[in-house]
Curated annotation (Swiss-Prot):
This is Heavy metal-associated isoprenylated plant protein 8. SUPFAM superfamilies: HMA, heavy metal-associated domain. It comes from Arabidopsis thaliana. A metal cation 1 binds at residues 46, 49. Residues 35-99, 125-189 form the HMA domain. Residues 1-31, 96-122, 191-226 are annotated as: Disordered. A metal cation 2 binds at residues 136, 139. Transmembrane segments: none annotated.
Length: 246
């Protein structure tokens, strides 16, 4: 008897859960099947405009009924559609871009979601030292010109006496060796690589150097100035008050 009671209680619980799940699914389907109504503001100056509006919405995305009011420039659309904005965009695309939604009120801020700005890390500048055989100045020029054409390379410094090439730029040194073999057809061997700091760190170091230097004062030497000396008019004939003896 006890086992039968437990089995009966478990069956009742399962039936209640199924009923709840069924009710929730029915509620969701009812919400989707509910008839909605939206009011659009569309400028219509004649019956032809009204027929164009109703023609572009007829049978679109669950639209069932369309009512146009030319005097008030309103279009009332009712039906079982999911998104009212689709109806508005349909009218803007097919009839007029100046169409607006009166009800339900729409918040444009919800659509204009600002994309998350990803912080771009400063690219790492690397310096790779490669071993390459260079027989003459022509080989040196060809290697330098060929490596400079590779994307991300900033500077190339070949040294014929040591058979080395110092390459600086934003790159992956092992891949650079493969590109040199494919494009130039020359053997290259990676000896060492150095990763430099980003641009931001360089700016900080420069600011520290400027602060340590302090304020500099520059003094300019005096300039040569020549003044024109006018002749004395004390004893001239034009001076009435000059000495008569003189």
């Amino acid at each position: 008897m006890g086992k039968n009671k437990q089995n009966g209680e478990s069956d009742n619980k399962s039936e209640k859960k199924n009923q709840k799940n069924g009710d929730s699914s029915v509620d969701k389907s009812d919400k989707k099947n509910q008839c909605k109504e939206i009011v659009l503001k569309v400028y219509m100056h004649c019956e032809g405009c009204a027929s164009q509006v109703s023609h572009c919405l007829r049978g679109y995305d669950g639209v069932e009924h369309i009512k146009t009011e030319i005097g008030d420039n309103k279009v009332v659309v009712s039906g079982k559609f999911d998104d009212p904005l689709k109806i508005l965009r349909r009218v803007q695309k097919k009839f007029s871009r100046n169409a607006e939604m009166i009800s339900p009120k729409h918040n444009p801020k919800q659509d204009q979601k600002e994309p998350q700005q990803k912080k771009e890390s400063a690219p790492e500048i690397k310096t790779a030292i490669l071993r390459m055989n260079m027989h003459c100045e022509g080989c040196v020029h060809e290697i330098k010109r060929g490596i400079e054409k590779i994307k991300g390379i900033q500077s190339v410094e070949p040294d014929r006496s040591k058979s080395t090439v110092v390459v600086r730029g934003v790159m992956d040194p092992p891949k650079l060796v493969e590109k040199i073999k494919k494009k130039l057809g020359k053997h290259a061997e990676l000896l060492s690589q150095i990763t430099e700091k980003g641009k931001d760190n360089n700016k900080k170091n420069n600011n520290k150097k400027e602060e340590s230097d302090g304020n500099k004062i520059f003094s300019y030497p005096p300039q040569y100035s020549s003044q024109h000396a006018y002749p004395s008019q004390i004893f001239s004939d034009e001076n009435v008050h000059s000495c008569s003896i003189m």
